[in-house]
Amino acid sequence: MKKSFLILVSFIFSVSLMAQEKTTPVSDVNALKSEMQQSASKIKTISSDFTQEKFMSVMASKMVSKGKFYYQKEDKVTLQYLTPFKQNLVMNGTKLMMEANGKKNVLDATSNPMMAELKKVISACMGGNIASMGSDYKLEFFQTGGLYLIKIYPQSVNIKKVAEMVDLYLDKKDFSVVKMKMLEPLKKGQKTNDYTEYIFENKKFNSPIDASVFSIK
């Protein structure tokens, strides 16, 4: 179960560390949250291409994967990895399925509070309903160029075990997720600088998605 959970974290989270770009604080956070919620209320489905880049300090180079991303309100998320290997991550209601090499592993979020929180984070981020994350997360809002940057700091001890921070980059035009990143948790009190980054491209909104995409069997 622990191994499966760590695999889940690697699948779900990602980020873009744009440290070289200047960011400025958002002056009216409440207005931004309101705009985000209005935009999110209009979104029923999202489909896009994605690129995942995983950096680990013990590796000589980044591990790059590509695939298809699907989201359906309220709580259905699928990542279909196409290269270099075919594998799937499906979140549907309280269930989560990881499929690779012809083998499936189905987990129940209701039996694992940590997994339930991670599911809430990914659904809130993808659906644009950041306000639903509640007091277990500290949020900071910035802007840079044509993007908003939301820094998400988990306050829950459980979540801190798997993520030190999440950076979420939103397109100012439609508040859709452009990039998303997770910084790995501290190890022995020290930062690892390890992270996973997702880049979302060719997004389509409110297009029909076949129910089989979110099927868990």
Predicted regions and their residues:
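Extended beta-sheet lipid-handling architectures
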Residues: 48-50, 64-66, 91, 152, ...
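A short, Trp-centered hydrophobic/proline-enriched beta-strand micro-motif
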Residues: 39-57, 78
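Flexible, membrane-facing loop/turn or short amphipathic-helix motifs
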Residues: 55-62, 187-191
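Sec-dependent N-terminal signal peptides
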Residues: 4-14
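Gly/Pro-enriched, hydrophobic low-complexity segments
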Residues: 130-217
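Positively charged n-region of N-terminal signal peptides that target proteins for export
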Residues: 1-4, 19-20
